[in-house]
Amino acid sequence: MDKLIVAKFGGSAIGVDGEGIPTILDRVKSLKSDSKLIIVCSAPLTKIDGKKRSLTDVMLDLGENAASGNNVTMEPIEQSYSNILQMVNDENKVECKKVIDEMLGLASESLTYANSEGKFEDEVRAKALAYSGEVLMSHVLNYILRSNDIQADSIALDDWPIITDDNIESTNFLFDQSNQRIEALNNKIKQYEVISIGGFIGKTEDGIITTYERGGSDRTAADIGILFHKKYETMIDLEKDSSVVSADPKVVENELDDVMELSYNEARLAGMFGMKLIDPIAIKEILENGVDMAVTITNMKSPEKITKIQRKPANQNGHPLKIVTGKKNCAILRIESTSAVDLLESLESEKRYSEFIILSPFTKDGLEFSRILFLDGDYVKRNEKYVLSFDSLATIAYQRGVITLIGDEMWRVQQIASKASSKIGDAGLNILNMDAQEETSRIIIVIEDSDDNVAKAIQAIHSERSKIKFV
C-alpha cells in the first residue's frame, strides 16, 4: 500500500505575508521524498497597526463593518497576497495573479452584498472567507510549489471532496457523501507529487459553501485522512512553528518538557482546554468513523521534534502528568438530571455541539442535579434561552476559569489531586469546584475567571510537576 501524508500548515506556519513559506518548501521536499503528499492550507497572516492578524479575522471585521453600512477596503488582504505573489516565478506569475484577482473579486462581491443587505452571515460569509483565505491560499501555494520544480496541483471548489451538512457557519462532515466525491482528488494524488487544498471549507450536497468552526483546518486534514485511510497507508502531520510541551510557553517559562506521545484522549482534552495542539473535533471525527490513524505534530523549524498522537501510545514510561492547561471564559450549568438528558441529546443531534464536559452530579432535597461545564461562555450566553428552556429552575454560573491536568496514566501519581489543589491555595486562589475521575484520569479544577487567575493556577501546578513522584 502506498504512503500518503496529509500535512496541515496553519496560519502561523505560513506566517506574515508568507514569510514561513521557505521553511514550508523545505518540509514539503522532505515529506514527499517517500510519500504522496496532500497539503491542507490555512489563511496566511498579515500585520495591521503592527499586530499579527489572520486574514480570516481581517475579512470577518470587513464583513461586519460592511454589514453595518460602512465603506470598507480590501487593501490589506490584496497587499498580503501581492507580497506572497513575489515568491512565484515569472513562468507562473501571470496565471497566479489572475487567480488572486478573480477570487478576491468574488470576496469583494460578498462584502458588497453584506453592505446592501445589512448582514454578513451564512453563505455570504463563507464565500468571503473561502475566496480570501484558505481556498485562495491553496491555489497560490500550488504556483509557489510549481515555481520550485515540484509536480503540484490544487483542488478547485468544483471538485471539493469535503461534503457537509447545511449548518453553514459551523458545519459537520458527512463521510458517505464525501466518499462519493473523492475521485478528482484521488486522480490528482496519482498524477502529482503534491496536492494543495484549503482547510476549514466545506460544501453541501447542493454546492453551498460552508465553514467549520475556527481551527477547522485540522478537521479538514483529519477528514481527508478518514476518506483515504483504506486506499493508502495514511498519516496526518500537523506542522507547527513550535513543539508540544507540558504547558503553554506563553504562560509557563520554566521546567517545560517536550511531550513525545499523546493518546487520542489526551490530545482531545488538551485541545478542548486551551492547548493549540489539534482541534478536538478532529479527534472526535476520527474516532466516530472507526479509524486508527497516526497523527503527528511536527515542529517545522526543528523537524526532529515530533509528538505522536495514537489511540494507545506505545511508550507509557514517561511522566504521567503530561500537560497542565486551562481555559478562561467558561460557564457551568446546574440542571435537574432528568432534564439534562434531553438537553444533551438536543445538543448532540440538533446543535451538533460538543464543547462541554459532564462533571460529577450532586443531590439536593432528594433530587439529582447534573453539572455541565461549557468551555465557551459566549456560546452559552448566545443560546441561554435555548439552554434554560429544558429546565426553568436551571442556573448558569459565568466567569469560570478551568484548569485541567492531562495524562491517561495519572493514577500512577501519588496524591496528585491534593497536591494540585494545595498549590492553587498557595497561589492565593479559591477553588470553586473540583472534579476528579479515576476512570478517565481526569482532574478539573474550577476557579473564578478574573484578572490572570487561570495563568497563576497553571503556573502553580506546573511548578510542582518536576517534584511529583510516581509509580
What spans do the regions from the language model cover?
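Nucleotide/pyrophosphate-binding catalytic subdomain
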Residues: M1-I278, E439, I445-D449, K469
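Residues within well-ordered alpha-helices
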Residues: R27, L141, A221, A282, ...
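Glycine-rich beta-alpha junction loops
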Residues: P44-L45, P161, S242-V244, N299-E304, ...
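Phosphate/diphosphate-binding loops
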Residues: Y264-N299
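A conserved regulatory-domain signal marking ACT and ACT-like small-molecule sensing domains
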Residues: K305-V471
